Amino acid sequence: MPELPEVETTLKGVSPYLKGFIIEKIVVRNPKLRWEVSKELSTFKHVKILNLTRRAKYLIIHTEQGYIIGHLGMSGSVRIVPHDNPVNKHDHFDIVMNNGKLLRYNDARRFGAWLWTNNLSEFHLFFKLGPEPLSETFNSTYLFKKSRQKSTALKTFLMDNSVVVGVGNIYANEILFLCGLHPQKIAKTLTKKQAEQLVFTIKQVLNEAIEQGGTTLKDFLQPDGRPGYFAQKLLVYGNKDKPCPRCGTKIKSIIIGQRNSFFCPQCQKK
């Protein structure tokens, strides 16, 4: 599933082909995604794109006619291709530009979304989102305070979008390993020093993943079709029964919150 670094990589990849250019039209081949594609998007003709930003795992396209909000879902990806590029299976959505290019959304599982709003501050899917992990707002004081009343597993706590956005399953595993913290540790037992270490490591891991173009495990590709290379640096995720890169103990896997969790029982004692 594309996580924050993959969406940031997508944002950087598509921006040069969209920002400042004109949308000639939007083609919707299958409106039935996770939420039905907003009908307003079919009315877009000769609309200028002003900017592109990201909120959590949502891609936001700022236009003269409001905001186009995209989410890649479980297996979605976007590519920049020429107008005459053949349409493939699962190509559900195109933003056709006036520069000979188009943004094409492909999603086999149809669990993504393309929505519209004229007011970002009132967009319902953003109401309960926590701070961006790479922002100054997300600091150790905030994380420590937020953890005080939480009896959930630390990994579940970090993946809660109301606490902080964008720390998905892959990166949560890597972050906890680097911090030497067991994924089942109860969040409210976190010390101030551990909160400081977590915040530092979250920022470090996500920044490095963005620099590497995200993580390609199955479905994600960068907008130019290249894979993300952070997968080559994964220390514990997907490495069950392989030796820990630090101590040689076999990596274990357990289910936490219906997600596979990988850890070293020696380096990450409960």
UniProtKB/Swiss-Prot annotation:
Entry's EC annotation: 3.2.2.23, 4.2.99.18
CDD domains given in the database record: EcFpg-like_N
Manner of cofactor binding, per the entry note: Binds 1 zinc ion per subunit.
Keywords: DNA damage, DNA repair, DNA-binding, Glycosidase, Hydrolase, Lyase, Metal-binding, Multifunctional enzyme, Zinc, Zinc-finger
ZnF endpoints (FPG-type): 235-269
Cited InterPro entries: DNA_glyclase/AP_lyase_DNA-bd, DNA_glyclase_Znf_dom_DNA_BS, Formamido-pyr_DNA_Glyclase, FPG_cat, MutM-like_N-ter, Ribosomal_uS13-like_H2TH, Znf_DNA_glyclase/AP_lyase, Znf_FPG/IleRS
GO MF annotation list: 8-oxo-7,8-dihydroguanine DNA N-glycosylase activity; class I DNA-(apurinic or apyrimidinic site) endonuclease activity; damaged DNA binding; zinc ion binding
GO biological process: base-excision repair
Domain of life from the UniProt record: Bacteria
Binding site for DNA: 90, 109, 150
Record-linked SMART domains: Fapy_DNA_glyco, H2TH
Cofactor(s), names only, from the UniProt record: Zn(2+)
Reactions catalysed according to its record: Hydrolysis of DNA containing ring-opened 7-methylguanine residues, releasing 2,6-diamino-4-hydroxy-5-(N-methyl)formamidopyrimidine; 2'-deoxyribonucleotide-(2'-deoxyribose 5'-phosphate)-2'-deoxyribonucleotide-DNA = a 3'-end 2'-deoxyribonucleotide-(2,3-dehydro-2,3-deoxyribose 5'-phosphate)-DNA + a 5'-end 5'-phospho-2'-deoxyribonucleoside-DNA + H(+)
Active-site residues from the entry: 2 (schiff-base intermediate with dna), 3 (proton donor), 57 (proton donor), 259 (proton donor)
Complex formation: Monomer.
Protein family according to the UniProt entry: Belongs to the FPG family.
NCBIfam families cross-referenced by the UniProt entry: fpg (TIGR00577), PRK01103.1 (NF002211)
Function per UniProt: Involved in base excision repair of DNA damaged by oxidation or by mutagenic agents. Acts as a DNA glycosylase that recognizes and removes damaged bases. Has a preference for oxidized purines, such as 7,8-dihydro-8-oxoguanine (8-oxoG). Has AP (apurinic/apyrimidinic) lyase activity and introduces nicks in the DNA strand. Cleaves the DNA backbone by beta-delta elimination to generate a single-strand break at the site of the removed base with both 3'- and 5'-phosphates.
Designated name of the protein: Formamidopyrimidine-DNA glycosylase
Annotated organism of origin: Histophilus somni (strain 129Pt)
Gene this chain is encoded by: mutM
